[in-house]
């Protein structure tokens, strides 16, 4: 039985949006936001300008969607790696946090995340968008982890939400330092040592 017209249209629209995001992501990483035009994006995606403006208000709106896409991919990667590591070598929740922070800092040296999220993101979208991104993908995850760690008595009882915001602020600053550094790998190592010392200090005595 043939699919309804509405279903086919929805599938086509989703495919067009995915093509635009894929093309824009590659261009924003390779050339940066300022050097990428909407003409570049529609040519790479092989769609019309009308299709682009049907899905996105303007180039900034497209960039916002790409940045969220990159951030979501990173979270999936971090969570997946953490689950795999926990299965292979079970450790304490504090150990898992230390490993997760190290993995996040490694990702900050990655081209997609560094260029789109760390370099262009704060400049193009401003601090409000950055705060929204960190809250959506960082604060909620850390709050849940901290609550579990407190319940298992690995760390002292503290306001989990406030502590999560403070840790995310540290991670955010570290990531921006790495993204703007002349030597990102060295900055990553230095920031990693400092953050690890802070996290170890959370251990319940």
What are these regions (language model features)?
Residues 65, 79-110, 163-167:
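Hydrophobic alpha-helical connector segments
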Residues 106-110, 143-144, 148, 167-185, ...:
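Amphipathic C-terminal alpha-helical segment
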Residues 46-56:
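Short hydrophobic/aromatic patch on the recognition helix
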Residues 30-34, 111, 152-153:
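Short coil/turn segments at alpha/beta junctions that flank glycine-rich nucleotide-binding fingerprints
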Residues 72-76, 95, 99, 118, ...:
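Amphipathic alpha-helical packing segments from all-alpha helical-bundle domains
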Residues 64-70:
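Alpha-helical DNA-contacting segments of helix-turn-helix folds
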Residues 108-128, 176, 180:
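Amphipathic alpha-helical segments used for helix-helix packing
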Residues 1-31, 35-47, 60-64, 87:
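Basic, helix-initiating cap at the start of DNA-binding domains
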């Amino acid at each position: 039985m043939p699919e309804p017209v509405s279903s086919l249209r929805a599938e086509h629209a989703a495919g067009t949006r995915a093509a635009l995001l894929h093309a824009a992501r590659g261009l924003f990483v390779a050339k940066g936001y300022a050097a990428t035009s909407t003409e570049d994006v529609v040519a790479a995606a092989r769609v019309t300008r009308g299709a682009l403006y049907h899905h996105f208000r303007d180039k900034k709106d497209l960039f916002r969607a790409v940045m969220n896409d990159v951030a979501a991919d990173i979270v999936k990667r971090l969570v997946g790696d953490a689950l795999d590591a926990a299965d292979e070598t079970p450790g304490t929740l504090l150990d898992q946090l230390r490993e997760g922070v190290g993995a996040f800092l490694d990702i900050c040296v990655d081209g997609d995340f560094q260029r789109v999220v760390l370099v262009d993101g704060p400049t193009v979208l401003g601090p409000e968008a950055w705060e929204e991104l960190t809250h959506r993908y960082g604060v909620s995850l850390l709050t849940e982890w901290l609550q579990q760690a407190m319940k298992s008595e690995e760390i002292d009882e503290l306001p989990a939400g406030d502590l999560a915001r403070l840790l995310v602020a540290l991670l955010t600053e570290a990531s921006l330092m790495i993204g703007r550094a002349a030597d990102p790998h060295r900055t990553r190592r230095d920031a990693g040592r400092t953050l690890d010392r802070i996290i170890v200090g959370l251990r319940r005595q």
